[in-house]
């Protein structure tokens, strides 16, 4: 029986890139992974020399003496970047090291074990790739493990509850810790925007609010310039909190028409605004287009935790912002309608969000 409120979206089953790299001595990239359609936009490696990517200090954000100035910085980061690094978030670094180690162990399980967690036909959760809608579609050079974590009744019974111990308990705690961080950030955003709690905070602090996780594994590639680890896109959710699992860089964000490599700070989270928050804020806060690139020598791993509005809630521009700005820039629709449209498409920059503009 399908869990209450759950909906079925699917992605076509594809081979494991990790296994393909492990089993064969690959010197050239298989045709289905060659991305001649890749964005050839210049990569600006010196960007951080000219201007600093925003860094938000959680401790200052929560202190009565420094809150106002840090909320201003947060507001600027969300308006001008849609992206920032979060330091002093309060989650113990030794616990985060445990999360990272167990994610690596999970991807290194024997294939026979991993098959238990593989995507099933007509489902999108599990090991595999997402947004694969046709057999001739070009694929990313990556494996991912995607699953819903909250609310508990939306968990697939063959996924989260069956994860090996202690990994399952570790992820349970990580889910709770990151959710607390996300709720604080969203509350501070609402403060900066001067909008009512029910227009933003309460949408993400509700029994129906959805939290999901995607663990990403990007194997080394003999021709890294021929492939893409993660297709350029903006996140379709409200807020994303990303943690780099190992020390290999590969995340790039698009700023002022150029791809900017992100250099993660030690023990920091990378936080980005998703399309749903752009809709709710009527375009005041902007989701950011980003991609993952790979290299020829080392694997890269990360974990993204997505925070979103409940499935049958309606989303649209906050009424108080529409009244202030005299215009609604996006359509109103339920999250189910939003996701039905989303999962019928391939990833393509911010094209889906653009289709919802008025």
UniProtKB/Swiss-Prot annotation:
The keyword Repeat does not apply. One of its GO terms (molecular function) is metal ion binding. One of its GO terms (biological process) is leaf senescence. Fe cation binds at residues 233, 235, 290. InterPro entries: DIOX_N, IPNS-like_FE2OG_OXY, IPNS-like_sf, Oxoglu/Fe-dep_dioxygenase_dom, Plant_2OG-oxidoreductases. Residues 209-309 form the Fe2OG dioxygenase domain. Induction: By virus infection. Unlike the homologous protein NCS1 of Coptis japonica, SRG1 has no norcoclaurine synthase activity. This is Protein SRG1. It comes from Arabidopsis thaliana.
């Amino acid at each position: 029986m399908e869990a209450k409120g759950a909906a079925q979206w699917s992605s076509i089953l594809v081979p494991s890139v990790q296994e393909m790299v492990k089993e064969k001595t690959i010197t050239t990239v298989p045709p289905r992974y060659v991305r001649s359609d890749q964005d050839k936009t210049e990569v600006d490696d010196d960007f951080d020399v000219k201007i600093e990517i925003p860094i938000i200090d959680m401790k200052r954000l929560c202190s009565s003496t420094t809150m106002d100035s840090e909320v201003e910085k947060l507001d600027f980061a969300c308006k001008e970047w849609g992206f920032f690094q979060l330091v002093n978030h309060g989650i113990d670094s030794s616990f985060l090291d445990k999360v990272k180690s167990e994610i690596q162990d999970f991807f290194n399980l024997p294939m026979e074990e991993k098959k238990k967690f593989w995507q099933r036909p007509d489902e999108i959760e599990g090991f595999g790739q997402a947004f694969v809608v046709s057999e001739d579609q070009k694929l990313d050079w990556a494996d991912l493990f995607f699953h819903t974590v909250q609310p508990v009744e939306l968990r697939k019974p063959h996924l989260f509850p069956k994860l090996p111990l202690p990994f399952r308990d570790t992820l349970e705690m990580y889910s709770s810790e990151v959710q607390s961080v996300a709720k604080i950030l969203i509350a501070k955003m609402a403060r900066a925007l001067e909008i009512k709690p029910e227009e933003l905070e309460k949408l993400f602090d509700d029994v129906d609010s959805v939290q999901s996780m995607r663990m990403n594994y990007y194997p080394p590639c003999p021709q890294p310039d021929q492939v893409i680890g993660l297709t350029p896109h903006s996140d379709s959710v409200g807020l994303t909190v990303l943690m780099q699992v190992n020390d290999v860089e590969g995340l790039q964000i698009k700023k002022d028409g150029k791809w900017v490599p992100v250099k993660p700070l030690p023990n920091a989270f990378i936080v980005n605004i998703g399309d749903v928050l752009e809709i709710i804020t009527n375009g005041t806060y902007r989701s950011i287009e980003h991609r993952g690139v790979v290299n020829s020598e080392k694997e890269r791993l990360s974990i993204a935790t997505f925070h979103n509005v409940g499935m049958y809630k309606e989303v649209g521009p906050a009424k108080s912002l529409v009244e202030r700005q005299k215009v609604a820039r996006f359509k109103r629709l339920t999250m189910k309608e939003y996701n039905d449209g989303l999962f019928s498409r391939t990833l393509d920059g911010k094209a889906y969000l653009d289709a919802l503009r008025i």
